[in-house]
């Protein structure tokens, strides 16, 4: 019945708050508990909540607002100053995971095309979970977090181009590589121009309207417009939302927007996003794939941790900061889930492997929060010991 959706929302909000609190009491970031509770109340365990189109859309709004908040908290000058490090981290986080995924696929008996796609899937990075963990830890404004966010942007661009190339080369889709690259150029050129000139003008134009919360509404209009524009041109909507947050952070409206959007995001939409990730897991028919799942999870974690960490180390970060950046890039999150769905529909990913890979993606997402907490803790202890 349609009204059962109201109960589902109430259950999601209650369970995420309780699970987040328990996670903090156990010394872990709150996001870990929220991810786990999605598995518990979802189809995999209790089955109280089933995936639906409405929950999916609420989840999409949640991740868009989460990345918009990350953009608001990002220092543009710091982001620009760390662009070389971000690019190196992104490259390290693509090359090693691709090789690891491709070789693993061949060893496990996959066909050539499936192995290539597995390598590309392991290249994906979603820092939305890392962003929440950094907020929990009070580390959003560190150099490491800025580098992670910049690397995620580069990673998204490169992975989309590589995916388009693979689909074209393997003959599974009619993909125009020139058009794919052109769309990326148009997106970022437009975002820079609109963010520099258009966003301040839009905020000034809409803020005097004699209606309630005109400034917040103006900010959300910009946020969702940027996200839509990104999706339209083949860039993840979360990148558009992140860019919108950065653009508004350069205006005088930053603090008011941040103060008023945060309750909207965290009271309703972000909890649905966290639960929806866990709800993607199902344990049906995975008994004979358990070793594949465990092996691929280890490969997925180590290749990102080492590859991204190496990129950071080569651009001036010390060992502990490099480990932090590597840990923050491990999560594949919703980005990899979308790519997996694309691979399944295009024939690049066999149905036999789909469920197992979804579980691997979610395991990497759940591993990220405790890894970030541990690596930041190790750095903080070292800094205190040196004083």
Swiss-Prot record:
Disruption phenotype: Disruption causes a major defect in inosine-dependent germination, but does not significantly affect germination in response to L-alanine.
Transmembrane domains' residue ranges: 29-49, 54-74, 87-107, 114-134, 149-169, 175-195, 219-239, 263-283, 290-310, 324-344, 347-367
Entry-linked InterPro entries: Cation/H_exchanger_TM, K/H_exchanger, Na+/solute_symporter_sf
A GO term from the CC aspect: membrane
GO BP, sorted A to Z: sodium ion transmembrane transport; spore germination
Keywords recorded for this protein, A-Z: Antiport, Germination, Ion transport, Membrane, Sodium, Sodium transport, Transmembrane, Transmembrane helix, Transport
Entry keyword annotation includes Transport: yes
Family in the record: Belongs to the monovalent cation:proton antiporter 2 (CPA2) transporter (TC 2.A.37) family.
Record NCBIfam families: 2a37 (TIGR00932)
Function, in words: Na(+)/H(+) antiporter that extrudes sodium in exchange for external protons. Can also use potassium as a coupling ion, without completely replacing H(+). This Na(+)/H(+)-K(+) antiport is much more rapid than Na(+)/H(+) antiport. Can also extrude lithium. Important for the inosine-dependent germination of spores.
Protein name: Na(+)/H(+)-K(+) antiporter GerN
Natural source organism: Bacillus cereus
The gene coding this protein: gerN
């Amino acid at each position: 019945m349609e009204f059962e959706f109201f109960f589902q929302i109430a259950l999601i909000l209650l369970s995420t708050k309780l699970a987040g609190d328990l996670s903090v009491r156990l010394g872990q970031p709150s996001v870990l508990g929220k991810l786990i509770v999605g598995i518990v109340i979802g189809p995999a365990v209790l089955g109280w909540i089933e995936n639906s189109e409405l929950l999916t859309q609420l989840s999409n709004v949640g991740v868009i607002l989460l990345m918009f908040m990350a953009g608001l908290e990002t220092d543009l000058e710091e982001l620009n100053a760390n662009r070389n490090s971000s690019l190196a981290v992104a490259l390290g986080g693509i090359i090693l995971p691709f090789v690891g995924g491709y070789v693993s696929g061949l060893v496990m008996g996959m066909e050539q095309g499936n192995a290539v796609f597995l390598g590309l899937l392991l290249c994906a990075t979603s820092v939305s979970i890392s962003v929440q963990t950094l907020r929990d830890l009070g580390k959003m404004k560190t150099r490491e977090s800025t580098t992670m966010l910049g690397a995620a942007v580069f990673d998204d661009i490169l992975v989309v181009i590589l995916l388009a190339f693979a689909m074209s080369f393997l003959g599974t889709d009619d993909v125009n590589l020139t058009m794919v690259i052109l769309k990326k150029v148009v997106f970022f050129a437009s975002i820079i121009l609109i963010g520099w000139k258009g966003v301040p003008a839009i905020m000034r134009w809409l803020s005097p309207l004699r209606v309630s919360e005109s400034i917040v509404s103006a900010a959300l209009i910009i946020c969702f417009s940027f996200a839509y524009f990104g999706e339209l041109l083949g860039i993840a909507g979360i990148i558009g939302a992140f860019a919108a947050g950065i653009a508004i952070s350069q205006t005088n409206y930053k603090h008011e927007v941040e103060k008023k959007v945060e309750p909207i995001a965290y009271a309703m939409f972000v909890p649905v996003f966290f639960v929806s990730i866990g709800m993607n897991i199902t344990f049906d028919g995975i008994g004979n794939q358990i070793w594949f799942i465990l092996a691929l999870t280890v490969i997925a974690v180590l290749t990102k941790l080492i590859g991204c960490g190496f990129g950071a180390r080569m651009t001036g970060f010390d060992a502990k900061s490099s480990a932090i950046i590597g840990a923050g890039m491990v999560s594949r999150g919703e980005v990899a889930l979308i790519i997996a769905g694309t691979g399944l529909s295009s024939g690049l990913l066999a149905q036999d492997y789909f469920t197992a890979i979804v579980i691997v993606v979610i395991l990497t997402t759940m591993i990220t929060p405790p890894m970030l907490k541990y690596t930041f803790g190790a750095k903080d202890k070292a800094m205190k010991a040196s004083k």
